[in-house]
């Protein structure tokens, strides 16, 4: 091809014309797309408020199957941002995924604290609010223990709650939960270090921690993407209605952050982040030590390989601290938010999570079905729900071989022999009725079906 000295200029001119035409096309649809962004709907799965306390609302989602699992799931989200990230859009909704798998699903919507709430601490959120919600869900389901699924800060609080109230939790699921903060490689660990940051000064200034303060901090962890790249990508995809709608839903969620109660913020930053007290098993809430060894029921950890907020090493070491011998970790190539909204996570991760809860919940025994759990004093202790052959062998070593022996023994002796918590012993006692209970003994009563873990 002969050399054309004008080719470069002609190519540049052609590219300019194409770019102008492209810009004109995008400009023509911009008003329509802007309207979509402004009116986009989120959190569309039908639910009713079944319990309220202060600002808190407990949501119960409408079932999507004819039959539901006997053991309900209570979803505990973080105290920051709105929980509808778990129900962002119908085809990428964790809530719907659980419902479609036959689970009975509840979720706590914390809503925004007022200035009057700035003195609420972790004790209030864990031992009052979460505990009251667990009791409400359990009562509505006619059960004595339920499943928990905690996300982010909600996962941390769920772990704390479970350690304090193990008898009320059948199985514990944790998503991107901050549980261990020592050399995790996470930016937040460095930024939240007591060497550089004092949460008390923030709270002394604001009372409650403003949502804008938190949002800007998270955005600055990846400033190029959060302040520039994503808007360029939006512009390049204005012609795609689906892309714009997905973008709008996420932006709405990011824009609707909520303030965080001041005292809870200080306690969380100082105790969990800076002092790593939960992982070191030295945390105290409400004057009671949070012994993570009490977490002896099935535990599931869902972690994102590329989670820049809660890296895998801020979650996985916790598995070695709990008292459970049934611990499962699902680590997936996604980020902190991607695990709840990405199409690949919904395809690869959530079916496994649904199955995990199903397999560890069983068909269950309701609290009013006493006739199914009536035993003679001479019955082998292994027949008690939750004991099984492993614990029965341990108990036999100290002479506890029958239902009558179990009734006569004190909780401390049983717990030490079996290698479980006294809370778990209380579960065993509640799970049966001895038809010939001796005078002065401690009869049990029927309860939920507890796994032998």
Question: What is each model feature region?
Answer:
Residues 311-320:
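Short alpha-helix in the alpha/beta-hydrolase fold that links the catalytic acid
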């Amino acid at each position: 091809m002969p050399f054309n000295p004008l080719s470069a200029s002609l190519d540049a001119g052609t590219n300019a014309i194409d770019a102008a035409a492209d810009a004109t096309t995008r400009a023509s649809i911009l008003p329509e797309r802007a309207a979509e962004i402004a009116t986009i709907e989120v959190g569309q799965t039908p639910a009713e408020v079944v319990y309220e306390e202060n600002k808190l609302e407990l949501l119960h989602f409408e079932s999507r199957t004819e039959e539901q699992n006997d053991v309900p799931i209570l979803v505990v989200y973080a105290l920051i941002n709105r929980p509808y990230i778990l129900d962002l859009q119908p085809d990428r909704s964790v809530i719907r995924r659980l419902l479609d798998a036959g689970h009975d699903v509840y979720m706590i919507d914390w809503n925004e604290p007022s200035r009057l709430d700035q003195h609420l601490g972790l004790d209030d959120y864990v031992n009052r609010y979460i505990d009251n919600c667990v009791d409400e869900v359990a009562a509505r389901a006619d059960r004595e223990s339920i499943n928990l699924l905690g996300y982010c800060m909600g996962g941390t609080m769920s772990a704390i709650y479970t350690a304090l109230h193990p008898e009320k939790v059948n199985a514990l699921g944790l998503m991107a939960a901050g549980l261990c903060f020592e050399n995790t490689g996470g930016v937040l660990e460095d930024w939240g270090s007591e060497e550089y940051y004092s949460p008390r000064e923030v709270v002394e200034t604001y009372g409650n921690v403003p949502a804008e303060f938190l949002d800007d901090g998270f955005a600055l962890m990846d400033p190029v993407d959060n302040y520039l790249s994503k808007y360029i990508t939006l512009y390049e995809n204005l012609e795609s209605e689906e892309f714009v709608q997905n973008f709008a839903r996420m932006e709405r969620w990011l824009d609707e952050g909520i303030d965080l109660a001041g005292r809870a913020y200080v306690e969380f930053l100082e105790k969990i982040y800076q002092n790593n007290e939960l992982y070191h098993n030295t945390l105290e809430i409400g004057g009671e030590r949070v012994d993570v060894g009490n977490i002896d029921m099935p535990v599931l950890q869902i972690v994102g390989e590329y989670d820049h907020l809660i890296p895998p090493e801020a979650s996985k070491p916790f598995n070695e601290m709990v008292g459970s011998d049934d611990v499962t970790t699902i680590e997936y190539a996604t980020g902190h938010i991607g695990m709840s909204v990405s199409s690949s996570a919904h395809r690869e991760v959530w079916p496994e999570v649904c199955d995990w809860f199903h397999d560890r919940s069983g068909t269950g025994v309701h609290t009013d079905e006493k006739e199914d759990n009536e035993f003679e004093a001479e019955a082998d202790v292994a027949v008690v729900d939750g004991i099984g052959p492993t614990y029965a062998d341990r108990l036999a070593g100290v002479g506890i071989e029958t239902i009558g022996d179990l009734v006569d023994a004190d909780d401390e002796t049983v717990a030490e022999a079996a290698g479980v918590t006294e809370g778990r012993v209380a579960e065993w006692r509640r799970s049966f009725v001895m038809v010939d209970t001796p005078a002065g003994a401690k009869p049990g009563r029927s309860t939920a079906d507890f796994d032998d873990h």
